[in-house]
Each structure stands twice: as structure tokens, then as C-alpha cells.
């Protein structure tokens, strides 16, 4: 187990934090792409201004 001195304020080690960040970012990019495409499609269909 990691020493308390190895843990950040989140309770994760540096390696765990980097792994969590990479998983989060790998999900964020596809979500953002789908959101942008959806907004463009709705704007083309029915502009809101």
C-alpha cells in the first residue's frame, strides 16, 4: 500500500491519478465530438438566432 506521503489530496497515488485522467479524457473527446455534431445538426435544422 502507498505511504500517506505518496498520496495527493485526493487519496490517489500519482500513477492512479494519471490512469484516471487518461480514462476520463478518452471518454471526454468522443462525448464532446457527439455534442458538437448534435448542436450543428440542430442549428442546421432549426437555427436558434
From Swiss-Prot:
The chain crosses the membrane at residues 28-45. This is Light-harvesting protein B-875 beta chain. It is found in: Cell inner membrane. Keywords: Antenna complex, Bacteriochlorophyll, Cell inner membrane, Cell membrane, Chlorophyll, Chromophore, Light-harvesting polypeptide, Magnesium, Membrane, Metal-binding, Signal-anchor, Transmembrane, Transmembrane helix. The core complex is formed by different alpha and beta chains, binding bacteriochlorophyll molecules, and arranged most probably in tetrameric structures disposed around the reaction center. The non-pigmented gamma chains may constitute additional components. It comes from Cereibacter sphaeroides (Rhodobacter sphaeroides). It is a single-pass type II membrane protein. A bacteriochlorophyll binds at residues 21, 39. One of its GO terms (molecular function) is electron transporter, transferring electrons within the cyclic electron transport pathway of photosynthesis activity. GO terms for biological process: photosynthesis, light reaction. The gene is pufB. PROSITE patterns: ANTENNA_COMP_BETA (PS00969). Residues 46-49 are periplasmic. InterPro entries: Antenna_a/b, Antenna_beta_CS, Antenna_beta_dom_sf, LHB-1/5, Light-harvesting_complex. The keyword Magnesium applies. SUPFAM superfamilies: Light-harvesting complex subunits (SSF56918). Belongs to the antenna complex beta subunit family. Pfam families: LHC.
